[in-house]
């Protein structure tokens, strides 16, 4: 009697777990959003207008590896990797990823730093920001800046970056 009761309880427990187990196996794990900075593959795709060839196969390989987004690193003269921002975005999306950010910068000239008038640099940033929006980038990262030697220069750079950020 005890053995039979034990067997029935075990069978009921197994049946109770089966639907949950089956549905859990049927569901796919959510895809993780993992991005890659394209600067890390610059030897394959080039940077700053110096193309190493067609970057589309590299984008496809990155997507096949599981990457879902990219950070570009080759903005120059309104172009990303030698393409219009719209074409670059299309190429990235055709590979199955999205452009999430880029990294680029424009350091102030000695004259701009001394005068505190960086309106020319801000005009460049306006064009840069418009291009990056067209490429689908949500963020622009400034990866580096020139060496600052005085508090006044640092304060000028702080005002400069605050102006850029407000755009």
Sequence positions of predicted segments:
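Catalytic domains of carbohydrate-active enzymes, especially glycoside hydrolases
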Residues: 55-75, 135-139
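Acidic-and-aromatic substrate-binding clefts and catalytic sites of carbohydrate-active enzymes
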Residues: 42-52, 72-85, 107-121, 146-155
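Conserved, mostly hydrophobic/aromatic
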Residues: 36, 62, 70, 92, ...
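Bacterial N-terminal signal peptides
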Residues: 9-17
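Bacterial N-terminal signal peptides that target proteins for export
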Residues: 1-9
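Hydrophobic faces of well-ordered beta-strands that scaffold small-molecule active sites
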Residues: 32-38, 70-72, 99-104, 140-142
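Active-site acidic/histidine proton-transfer and metal-coordination neighborhood
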Residues: 91, 98, 109-167
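Boundary/entry segment of secreted carbohydrate-active catalytic domains
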Residues: 27-55
């Amino acid at each position: 009697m005890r053995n039979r009761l034990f067997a029935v309880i075990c069978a009921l427990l197994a049946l109770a777990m089966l639907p949950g187990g089956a549905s859990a196996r049927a569901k796919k794990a959510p895809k993780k959003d993992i991005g890659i900075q394209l600067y890390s593959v610059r030897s394959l795709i080039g940077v700053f207008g110096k193309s190493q060839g067609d970057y589309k196969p590299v984008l496809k390989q990155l997507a096949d590896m599981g990457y879902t987004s990219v950070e570009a690193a080759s903005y120059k003269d309104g172009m990303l990797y030698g393409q219009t921002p719209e074409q670059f975005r299309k190429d990235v999306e055709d590979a199955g990823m999205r452009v999430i950010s880029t990294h680029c910068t424009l350091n102030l000239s000695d004259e701009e730093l001394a005068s505190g008038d960086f309106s020319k640099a801000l005009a460049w940033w306006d064009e840069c920001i418009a291009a990056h929006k067209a490429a689908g980038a949500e963020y622009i990262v400034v990866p580096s800046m020139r060496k600052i030697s005085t508090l006044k220069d640092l304060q000028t750079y702080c005002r400069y970056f605050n102006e850029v950020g407000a755009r």
